[in-house]
């Protein structure tokens, strides 16, 4: 193969393998609208996966009486992400700046990079997706990188990275098949769904503020 053709193929392969193109002299600046579109696609995918998996798990394993007692008990329904200061209603959310909402979203994403491993068997056995833990982890990492890129663009025009948030969820015994293990998995799925919903909502608000014509969908 000619040297020129080989170089072209390598360049094309590199571009396809990078979901978030690094901004520098080698590449033109990626439009902000495209960066938001990429982030929103991943956020929506994660939220939909979390919602469907939670619903499927609930219908298959959690009796109604257990569901109600779980949701009404602050100790079992409290998510670790509650320790991350987040707006609790629409008014508070609108008062946050774009960078604040992106930072909150980044912390929420990073808080799941380790705990999501405890749900590997749940994702693998899901009839809705049958996805693997690594697929979910890759989506989280891609979205983490995308949010960091957006923060850099909105702040000073450059990409940025941040400290990974250290998870402190209690260890979940996914190897056990007793009711306690089921409720622990149910609790994790409940929190995962809740946090992915927040992330998609916050990103949608920032996109609406930042990209003309992106509101209302």
From Swiss-Prot:
Compartment annotation: Secreted
Keywords associated with the record: Disulfide bond, Hormone, Metal-binding, Phosphoprotein, Secreted, Signal, Zinc
The UniProt record lists the keyword Hydrolase: no
Gene Ontology MF annotations: growth factor activity; growth hormone receptor binding; hormone activity; metal ion binding
One GO-annotated biological process of the protein: positive regulation of receptor signaling pathway via JAK-STAT
Gene, per the UniProt record: GH1
InterPro entries: 4_helix_cytokine-like_core, Somatotropin, Somatotropin/Prolactin, Somatotropin_CS
Disulfide bonds, paired cysteine numbers: 79-191, 208-215
Signal sequence interval, chain numbering: 1-26
Residue list for modification Phosphoserine: 132
Recorded GO CC terms: extracellular space
CDD domains: somatotropin_like
Family label: Belongs to the somatotropin/prolactin family.
Described purpose of this protein according to its UniProt entry: Plays an important role in growth control. Its major role in stimulating body growth is to stimulate the liver and other tissues to secrete IGF1. It stimulates both the differentiation and proliferation of myoblasts. It also stimulates amino acid uptake and protein synthesis in muscle and other tissues.
Keyword Cytoplasm annotated: no
Residues annotated for Zn(2+) binding in this entry: 44, 200
Protein name, per record: Somatotropin
Major place of residence: secreted
Pfam families assigned: Hormone_1
Organism: Macaca mulatta
């Amino acid at each position: 193969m000619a040297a020129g053709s080989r170089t072209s193929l390598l360049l094309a392969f590199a571009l396809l393998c990078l979901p978030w193109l690094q901004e520098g002299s080698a590449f033109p600046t990626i439009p902000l609208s495209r960066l938001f579109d990429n982030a929103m696609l991943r956020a929506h995918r994660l939220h939909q996966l979390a919602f469907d998996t939670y619903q499927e798990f609930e219908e298959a394993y959690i009796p109604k009486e257990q569901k109600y007692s779980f949701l009404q008990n602050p100790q079992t329904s409290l998510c670790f992400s509650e320790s991350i200061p987040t707006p609790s209603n629409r008014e508070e959310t609108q008062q946050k700046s774009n960078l604040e909402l992106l930072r909150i979203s980044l912390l929420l994403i990073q808080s799941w990079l380790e705990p999501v491993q405890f749900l590997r068997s749940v994702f693998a056995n899901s009839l809705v997706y049958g996805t693997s833990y690594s697929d979910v982890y890759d989506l989280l990492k891609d979205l983490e990188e995308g949010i960091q890129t957006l923060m850099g663009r909105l702040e000073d025009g450059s990409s940025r990275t941040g400290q990974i948030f250290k998870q402190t969820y209690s260890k979940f015994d996914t190897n056990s098949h007793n009711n306690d293990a089921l409720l622990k998995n149910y609790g994790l799925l409940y929190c995962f769904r809740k946090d992915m919903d927040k992330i998609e909502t916050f990103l949608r608000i920032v996109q609406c503020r930042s990209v003309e014509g992106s509101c209302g969908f």
